[in-house]
Amino acid sequence: MYKRQVPEYSNEDKAICYGITGGVAKYLSMIDPRKSIDENIIRLFFRTDGYLYDETRNLLTQEFSDIAVVNNIVEQIASGENTLNTIAGKIGEKEQTVLYSLDKLINVGLVEKKKCITEEKNKKKTQYVLKDYMFKFWYEFIPKATSVIEMGQGEVYYERAVKPVLHSFMGSVFEEMCRYYTLMKGITGEYGCFITSVGTWWGVENIADKNGNIRAQSADIDVVALSDIDKRAVIGECKFKNEKIDKGIYETLIRRGSLITAKYKISKYIFFSLSGYTDWFETLSDENVLLLTLDSLYE
């Protein structure tokens, strides 16, 4: 999976490599290990002769006849619209038309249904997300840069508009990597229970402000691994950022764990960080908390 990358690269660059190719062997073979990850991204995506510059258009044209509708749907999902009614509303199509195209996109592996892991039968908690990371990267950055790339200024665009937000793009990729890692460890019983499924959770939590007033706010948990045999759960928070994880992030995950404890007892709280942890964690003594880094995923 994510480990099948360019061995010469650092683990951070390996992860980014996975994020822009989805781990597809064909695309990985085009990465030149003698060049930096930035040089490879520019060469493949941000030049008119780059192989991946036109790859998404070519693949969609081969698979779909209603290319305009499909393209609009994928653009909306890439921009963050993830429910049937919002996608249909944004592109001005009937929900049945959009659903038909979504089903085809799912069948060819470009889109998947994402469900809240503790409420998988709740249709209202279904989101559509891009499953293919190469498509996700392309749709997030290339369409708005086409004119600049065709003027031969793709490298400038990448340096100014893409590279500064590359870690942000990698956020959801890193979360998926961490879920996979958690499942692989969990099926061996490493967390004190036998993990049978992994996913994510989202919903609403009630927060008290400094005056004691209660307000509702949206909440999510990046990694939720469940043991339906033991009725236990492992939950995690993932940060692919240059900043270290601090006490506030720790407290948020601990608090949000209470949102699923009606059904499952929390066995472990796992933190995954690209850049490590603040000094506060040196004083933390809790055997139920695991502090991992990106390097942990590649061991």
What residues fall within each predicted segment?
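Amphipathic alpha-helical "lid/sensor" segments that cap RecA-like P-loop NTPase cores
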Residues: 6-59
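A short, conserved structural fragment
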Residues: 106-117
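Conserved small/polar residues in nucleotide/adenosyl-binding loops
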Residues: 1-5
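Short, Lys/Arg-rich nucleic-acid/phosphate-binding segment
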Residues: 115-127
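Winged-helix-like regulatory helical subdomains adjacent to P-loop NTPase cores
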Residues: 37-89
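A cross-kingdom feature that marks ATP-driven nucleic-acid transaction machinery
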Residues: 126-299
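Short amphipathic alpha-helical interaction segments
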Residues: 91-108
